[in-house]
């Protein structure tokens, strides 16, 4: 039994490393990118300025509505979307080179969940690519589901995660580790986090969760000499073994509702949430529960970025701020304007962050001073976070008017 369990762990770790090796530095296979921290490799030629006509390689109409961030692997882009008139949720696949749609697969049809916040959508999670399959989470009616699709768009399996009562919406994306896809659905009627077999959807492990709504996506970090899957929310910061679901440690220290995904410097994890209280903190990632520092800044929806011992944040209320990651000391704070429901991306020493009204700010990751490089307007509503691949930036934006329409733009020098 022990030998079989050990072989399972070794095999899963091998497959995890093999899957990562399938991707290149220009791939963006899951929420927050290849390294799950919102950072991309700097490539010469990535624009800092654009408009509806300037530096637009292509734009493509995206049917329906969604906050799903683009997923990009090789020459293909994947998005989740929801048609609120026809009542179906789907995944679309586009050609990266010209933006043309290759396929669209209906994943769910039927009565949508009720009670969404006006800033939420019925396609709020990001598609995950593991090199062989696609994984996506949706809530339909009163049930949360995880689904797997082939790269040709054909549905492979579908698994109910559990009953789901909408409070704000649903935004926890799948996470892949080894042979397991992890899915989470925190809800005020009692949720769960599960490890499913990637090939079949069979449940391998399950942990019941507190009766609180929460929207975070787990990430795997290496700390204290082990791989830990860490996430916050439900008034807890939790670390699980991603292969077995075993609880490594869990401490109080978060607020109930968190949307942002935590980041780490290897020894600390940086968490934030925004309801019913604002909470941002640096926690020592050893299970001790020791808080290195904390403050009451509202970083509810946007996720943080970390570079060279400094944290960079686009706050919900429209400020950019830089903190010393070791001490929490504020380096600078600057008003950008508008509200932010997206997470910024970092490319080298540049940060790209889009506000709700469609303006994307480009500024330096510089702890000594705030320096704005450019501010670019595209569309008039943005909920999906930008991604970067090579010398192109991809923006999912909406134009509101008599008829609201969404588009995906490929921004590159032309």
Where on the chain are the PLM-derived regions?
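Positively charged n-region of N-terminal signal peptides that target proteins for export
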Residues: 1-4
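Noncatalytic, solvent-exposed loop/strand surfaces
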Residues: 19-414
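Bacterial N-terminal signal peptides
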Residues: 6-16
